[in-house]
Amino acid sequence: MTAVTSDGTPQAAKVRVRFCPSPTGVPHVGMVRTALFNWAYARHTGGTFVLRIEDTDADRDSEESYLALLDALRWLGLNWDEGPEVGGPYGPYRQSQRTDIYREVVAKLLATGEAYYAFSTPEEVENRHLAAGRNPKLGYDNFDRDLTDAQFSAYLAEGRKPVVRLRMPDEDISWDDLVRGTTTFAVGTVPDYVLTRASGDPLYTLVNPCDDALMKITHVLRGEDLLSSTPRQVALYQALIRIGMAERIPEFGHFPSVLGEGTKKLSKREPQSNLFAHRDRGFIPEGLLNYLALLGWAIADDHDLFSLDEMVAAFDVVDVNSNPARFDQKKADAVNAEHIRMLDSEDFAGRLRDYFTTHGYHIALDPANYEAGFVAAAQLVQTRIVVLGDAWDLLKFLNDDEYSIDSKAAAKELDADAGPVLDVACAVLDSLVDWTTASIEDVLKVALIEGLGLKPRKVFGPIRVAATGALVSPPLFESLELLGRARSLQRLSAARARVTSA
C-alpha cells in the first residue's frame, strides 16, 4: 500500500518506524527480532526508530517488565531516537499516559459517524445468528450500526453501558505487504470492532493505530501474528484521515513466525525464548543479534556471519522471507562462538571480566599483576568457548577452593606410569629460574620427552590432570605460568602422592 496524504496523493516521507512492546514478562527473542529489524531499517534509511510502550493493560503490565525491556534494548545496543527516557515531539511514549488523547479521538470518531455506540451482548448476537440460520460463533453482526433514538434511549434506560465500535467499510481491504505481497480481506469478513470497553477504557485496536497516526509512523513492521488485526487498523487509518487526525496510511510488513520445536511458534514457556537466559549463559550482543537476523533474513547466500554495521548497510525489509523460521540453539551457539573469536583480546577480556563480576566469579591470580594475568587467562579460552559462561569451567582451576581432580581424569592419567613423569616434572620445575610459558615448555620437553624417551601424550596428560584437575583445560604451559611456581609444584606433588598411595 502506498502511503497517501489526506487528498489521496502519494507522499514521500522520511522513514519512521516503531517498536511497541507490552511490558509483560521477560523479553522474548521473537520480540527482539522485531525490534532489530525495525532498528536496522531505520538506520539503513536514515530514518527514526521510535520506542513506544503499550501499557494499557493494568492487570498484566508491570514496571519490572518495563525496566527489563529498556535493559534488554540497551544491552543489545538498539538505541531509540524517540521514546521513554529520551523524549521526542510526539510524546508521551507510554500509552498509559495518553488517555486524554484517545478520548479526544473517540469523541471525533463518534461525532462524524465513523464510530458508534453498541449495546448488544454476546448472547444477543449469538441468538440473532441462530434465528437467521447462521453459525452462532460468527461474531458481531453490526446490529447496532443504525439504532433509532428510541432504541438508544431504551438501552440507556435499562442501565446498559455501550462499547464504541468502528464502522468498517463496505468494501475489500487490501494492502501491498512489504514481506508477504498483496494481501486482501474480503468485505464482510471483518465486522465492526470494539475501540473502547463499556468502561471507556481504550483497547489495543484503537490505541495502536491511533498512536501510529499521531506519531507519523511511515512503516508498521511487526510479526505475522498481528496480521489479522491489520484490516481493522487500515480502516481506522482511513477514518482518522477523513476526520483530519492522520496524514497517511503507513506501509505494512509482517515478519514470519519464530518457531520452536516442530511447527509450533516458539512459546514463552520454552527456555530458548527468554532473551535474558541467553545473556546469562554468556551470549554477546553481536552474536545473538547476528543469529536473530538470520530468522527471516540473510545478508548473502554464501555467509551467515556479519556485524551490526554490515547488517545496517544491507538491510531492506523487502528482503525478509515470509516463511517461518525455526530457532536452532546449536546454530545460535555456533554464531556466538564465531563473534567471540572475532573480538580483539582486550575487548574480550573486558567483557569476560564484566561477566565474571556479574555472576560472582573470581579467578585467583597474582595480585601484583592481576589485570595482565586476567587478559592472559582470557586469551587462553577465547577460541575454546561458545558462550562466556564456558570460560569459568575452563579457568576455575586457578582457584584453590574450586580445584579438585576429577575421578575419571585421575583413573586415566594418574596411573603407575605417571609417577616418574611427575617426579621429573617437579624436579625440573622446582629449579626453574624463569617462570614463563616458554621456559616451562622447554624444560619439560627436554626432561620428559628427550630425557625419559616418552611421547608427549604420556608425559603431559598426567601433568595437565595434576595442575588443572581435568582432562581438558587451557594450554598446559600457559596454565602453569598463571598458576605460579608454588601452586604448580604443590599440585604436582599432591598428585604424585596420590599415585604412590594408589
Curated annotation (Swiss-Prot):
Biological process according to GO: glutamyl-tRNA aminoacylation
EC number, UniProt record: 6.1.1.17
GO CC term (a single one): cytosol
Residues involved in ATP binding: K268
Keywords annotated in UniProt: Aminoacyl-tRNA synthetase, ATP-binding, Cytoplasm, Ligase, Nucleotide-binding, Protein biosynthesis
Subcellular location per the Swiss-Prot or TrEMBL entry: Cytoplasm
GO molecular function, one term: glutamate-tRNA ligase activity
Catalytic reactions of this protein: tRNA(Glu) + L-glutamate + ATP = L-glutamyl-tRNA(Glu) + AMP + diphosphate
Pfam families linked to this entry: Anticodon_2, tRNA-synt_1c
Protein purpose: Catalyzes the attachment of glutamate to tRNA(Glu) in a two-step reaction: glutamate is first activated by ATP to form Glu-AMP and then transferred to the acceptor end of tRNA(Glu).
NCBIfam families to which the protein is assigned, alphabetical: gltX_bact
Protein's name in the database: Glutamate--tRNA ligase
Gene: gltX
